[in-house]
Amino acid sequence: MKLQLVAVGTKMPDWVQTGFTEYLRRFPKDMPFELIEIPAGKRGKNADIKRILDKEGEQMLAAAGKNRIVTLDIPGKPWDTPQLANELERWKQDGRDVSLLIGGPEGLSPACKAAAEQSWSLSALTLPHPLVRVLVAESLYRAWSITTNHPYHRE
């Protein structure tokens, strides 16, 4: 199974690149994890936000292909670490690759939400999208460590 983080936005701050890459390199060869960045639509004073969201959504869904789609969204299910580890195991047993979708400043398009098989909420707080990338990478790595009894996670 391959994990894929599909996120709106490019040109992240160095701390995001450093943090994300640190967890990316830790993933085992049998569970590769990759980042696909979708360029954010140009937002201005008179921007057509619906059109921008729709275009970003089309690109995200195209990148995900036939993968299981899991959206990251405030109204999603709040998994704790053991629950995420259980989900990771279920995804592995399912045999399909998994695409986790992070929207831009206005969130995800209706098409992305409709295509999602699952929706995960990291927090009831609104989090900056660059930070979410690092949190997701660390959370998935921690979940993997639980499923393999790796010492990274301690009870």
From Swiss-Prot:
- Name the Pfam families on file: SPOUT_MTase
Entries under CDD domains matching the protein: RlmH-like
One term of GO molecular function? rRNA (pseudouridine-N3-)-methyltransferase activity
Top EC class for this record: transferase
- What cystine linkages occur within this chain? none
Task: Name the chemical reaction catalysed here.
Answer: pseudouridine(1915) in 23S rRNA + S-adenosyl-L-methionine = N(3)-methylpseudouridine(1915) in 23S rRNA + S-adenosyl-L-homocysteine + H(+)
Binding positions for S-adenosyl-L-methionine per the UniProt entry: 72, 103, 122-127
In the UniProt record, the signal sequence range is none
The UniProt keywords, alphabetically, are: Cytoplasm, Methyltransferase, rRNA processing, S-adenosyl-L-methionine, Transferase
Cellular localisation: Cytoplasm
EC identifiers of the protein: 2.1.1.177
The answer, when asked if DNA repair is one of the entry's keywords, is no
Main localization is cytoplasm
Q: Which GO terms describe its cellular component?
A: cytoplasm
Please give the HAMAP family that the UniProt record associates with this protein. Answer: 23SrRNA_methyltr_H
Spell out the subunit comment.
Answer: Homodimer.
UniProt family annotation: Belongs to the RNA methyltransferase RlmH family.
Q: What does this protein do?
A: Specifically methylates the pseudouridine at position 1915 (m3Psi1915) in 23S rRNA.
Q: What is this protein called?
A: Ribosomal RNA large subunit methyltransferase H
Species, as recorded: Salmonella arizonae (strain ATCC BAA-731 / CDC346-86 / RSK2980)
